[in-house]
């Protein structure tokens, strides 16, 4: 630390020299990196260009910082064509010299999805070429194609082409690509959830988080929010096309061709269920074909839906339970449990709905939406629980507490959680009510299906 002022002086002294006079690539690397860290991209540029041109395989920082430096130049220089051309070639060079990350895993998907992103952002190529670049990155290396913004723009580019009437971009192709990208979002979300769940379990056990834990949690929360935002945007786009009026004839026309394709059947059934098209006879055909082809957690769940629709709740729950037995992955099981809870909530089976929501949380502690569902169950029971008006309204405190927990385990739900908490709290007894009834700090127990209690706030 004592030498820091001297180091800064040295760096700025170097910065005043022309890049051509500094022959040592490692020195240039250090100089441009220091400038780039403080976003002084103009000063970084000449030193960076020297390293890129003379020592392209020296360090991957040349490409990581180069992307930022060139992006700045493109946005801030009137004559930016040169920088656009350099950026275009930067990604090709990046993959040529650093095709794998430090763990030995391919970076093709990451690098070329970034290239497609830059092509889109700076409008340097036709949409078809931008999409082809995204598509090559995704199909050749889906593992490292993980940036949520790039995933969203990958699909949005195809959607724009579809709406503009591009040849060969059919509705079928659009839905198929949506499923591909949506499933990738799920995979990335599961990775983030595993990190958050590990840390949440440590916190719940009363253990102290290490600095590494805190950093991992912070990064996972930030990425989780971004993932959730772009996934919601993706769903918003497809919802414009995914009506029952569009889905049913589309899947009907393709059914015979795909009735032996397990993946296609699962996707079609899932989409029809999500859009509440399960009353159509086609849904029955899809489910029966899927179950006869390969009895699985998915097919058993969909049969449960059919039984539920027919009012056969006991049989429906039996198939839901079979679905859970057939599913070995805890995170997929959590999603099934949540969907079962949501179905039961719609049918007014509150106690059973909470049971499945809590089981979902046991499998995935970071599933904030399960807390949102339970909070809604409590709020819907305000008139059914409690021996007097004060106790009936007190149920809203329990609902508010539960809604608050959603944001604790899943920060991407912060806005929803806060709005619900405020809404429920606003319907709970006021300070005047508490004072008048003399209930401050009293514990109120609910003998209805809730079988829980809440402590009245202190004045």
Regions found by a protein language model. Name each.
Residues 1-25, 67:
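Bacterial Sec-dependent N-terminal signal peptides
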Residues 20-282, 293-294, 418-424, 434, ...:
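Preference for long, solvent-exposed alpha-helical segments and helix-linker "stalks"
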Residues 33, 68, 117, 156, ...:
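Residue-level recognition of tetratricopeptide repeat
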Residues 48, 84-91, 134, 287, ...:
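Hydrophobic/aromatic packing residues within the alpha-helices of TPR/SEL1-like helical repeat arrays
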Residues 51, 94, 137, 289-290, ...:
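Canonical positions in the second alpha-helix
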Residues 58, 295-296, 332, 366:
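Short helix-capping/linker turns of helical repeat alpha-solenoids
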Residues 301-314, 321-368:
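Alpha-helical adaptor scaffolds
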């Amino acid at each position: 630390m004592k030498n820091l002022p001297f180091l800064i002086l040295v760096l700025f002294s170097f910065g005043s020299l022309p890049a051509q006079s500094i022959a040592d690539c490692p020195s240039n690397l250090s100089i441009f990196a220091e400038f780039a860290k403080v976003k002084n991209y103009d000063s970084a540029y000449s030193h960076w260009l020297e390293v890129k041109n003379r020592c392209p395989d020296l360090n991957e920082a040349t490409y990581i910082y180069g992307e930022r430096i060139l992006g700045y130049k493109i946005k801030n220089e009137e004559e930016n064509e040169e920088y656009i051309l350099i950026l275009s070639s930067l990604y090709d060079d990046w993959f040529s010299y650093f095709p794998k990350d430090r763990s030995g895993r391919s970076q093709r998907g990451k690098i070329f999805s970034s290239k497609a992103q830059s092509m889109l952002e700076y409008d340097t190529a036709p949409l078809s070429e931008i999409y082809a670049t995204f598509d090559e990155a995704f199909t050749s290396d889906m593992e490292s194609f993980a940036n949520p913004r790039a995933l969203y723009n990958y699909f949005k580019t195809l959607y724009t082409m579809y709406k503009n009437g591009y040849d060969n971009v059919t509705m079928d192709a659009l839905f198929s690509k949506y499923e591909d990208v949506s499933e990738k979002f799920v995979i990335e979300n599961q990775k983030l959830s595993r990190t958050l769940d590990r840390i949440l379990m440590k916190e719940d056990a009363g253990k102290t988080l290490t600095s590494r834990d805190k950093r991992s949690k912070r990064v996972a929360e930030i990425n989780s929010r971004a993932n959730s935002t772009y996934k919601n945007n993706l769903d918003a786009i497809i919802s414009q096309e995914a009506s029952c009026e569009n889905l049913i004839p589309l899947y009907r026309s393709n059914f015979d061709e795909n009735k032996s394709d397990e993946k296609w059947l699962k996707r079609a059934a899932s989409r029809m269920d999500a859009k509440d098209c399960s009353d159509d006879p086609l849904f029955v055909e899809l489910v029966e074909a899927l179950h006869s082809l390969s009895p699985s957690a998915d097919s058993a769940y969909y049969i449960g839906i059919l039984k539920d629709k027919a009012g056969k709740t006991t049989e429906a729950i039996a198939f839901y339970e079979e679905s859970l037995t057939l599913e070995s992955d805890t995170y997929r099981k959590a999603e099934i449990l949540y969907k079962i809870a949501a179905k039961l909530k719609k049918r007014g089976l509150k106690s059973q709905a909470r049971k499945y929501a809590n089981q979902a949380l046991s499998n995935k502690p970071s599933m904030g939406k399960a807390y949102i569902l339970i909070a809604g169950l409590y709020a819907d029971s305000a008139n059914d629980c409690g021996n007097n008006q004060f106790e009936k309204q007190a149920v809203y405190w329990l609902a508010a507490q539960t809604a608050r927990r959603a944001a604790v385990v899943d920060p991407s739900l912060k806005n929803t959680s806060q709005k619900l908490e405020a809404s429920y709290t606003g319907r709970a007894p006021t300070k005047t009510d508490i004072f008048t009834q003399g209930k401050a700090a009293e514990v109120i127990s609910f003998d209805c299906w809730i079988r829980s209690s809440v402590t009245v706030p202190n004045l």
